[in-house]
Amino acid sequence: MRLLGCFFLIFLTWGSARAQGEYCHGWLDSAGNYQAGFQCPEDFDTADANICCGSCALRYCCAAADARLEQGSCTNHRELEKSGVSAQPVYVPFLIVGSIFIAFIIVGSLVAVYCCTCLRPKQTSQQPMRFTLRSYPPETLPMILTSGNLRTPSRQSSTATSSTSTGGSVRRLSSSRADPGYLVSSPPPPYSSAHSIHLNPSSTFLVSNQYFPYPLQPEAIANKSCPDFRQS
């Protein structure tokens, strides 16, 4: 019984394979459109149309063995592989080239900065500058010396004033001594003291002649008392 069952299955399989016929693979037509493959015979074909006939660009099922198509010689029977990546736009290559150029500029700038930082010599600590006349050109030395002299006008003016006053007092003293009829003294201060002293005949008190309209004799001065300016 098992053998009969096996033979029956083999017969059904062979009969179904014989009834199906050839398989026409999918192809690309002349317009570039893909046509899906099919099994001969199709639904609208007769039962004996189990052979794939026609050309590489147009395929159909037929019963004539001499019209059979050698599908192995066709190159347009393969289905285009569907990729998950969509078609890239036109500007993508330009975007890639621009990105590479910008990256090259950035990398070059970083390398240049690194090289300049590492190869630049270290600066030594600057020592304080010393002022010397040798450091200035000869043309500027008169200006420096002149400016140095202009900084001390007060000392020179005070020295000149003191020398002038000293010279004037010396001249007045010498002119007073030249005249034997007058007694020369320095001018008294603008204040006077209430105390008075008697001058000794041996001591003399010199009074300038500018305070008297007439000449005085030494004897008249000896018997008079004058205010004491030393105690003030």
UniProtKB/Swiss-Prot annotation:
Q: Name one GO cellular component term.
A: endoplasmic reticulum membrane
Membrane topology, Cytoplasmic segments: 115-232
Membrane-topology annotation of the record = Single-pass type I membrane protein
TM regions (residue ranges): 94-114
Which superkingdom is the protein from? Eukaryota
Q: Span of the secretion signal?
A: 1-19
Q: Does the keyword Repeat apply?
A: no
Pfam families in the record: Shisa_N (PF13908)
Q: What is its main location?
A: endoplasmic reticulum
According to the UniProt topology, which residue ranges lie Lumenal? 20-93
Q: Where is the composition biased (Low complexity)?
A: 151-177
Q: Extra notes?
A: 'Shisa' was named after a sculpture form, common to southern Japan, with a large head similar to the Egyptian sphinx.
**Record note on quaternary structure:** Interacts with fzd8 and fgfr1.
UniProt similarity note = Belongs to the shisa family.
Q: What does this protein do?
A: Plays an essential role in the maturation of presomitic mesoderm cells by individual attenuation of both fgf and wnt signaling. Regulates head and somite developmen. Inhibits both wnt and fgf signaling through the regulation of protein maturation and cell surface transportation of their receptors within the endoplasmic reticulum.
**In its UniProt entry, what is this protein called?**
Protein shisa-3
Taxonomic path: Eukaryota, Metazoa, Chordata, Craniata, Vertebrata
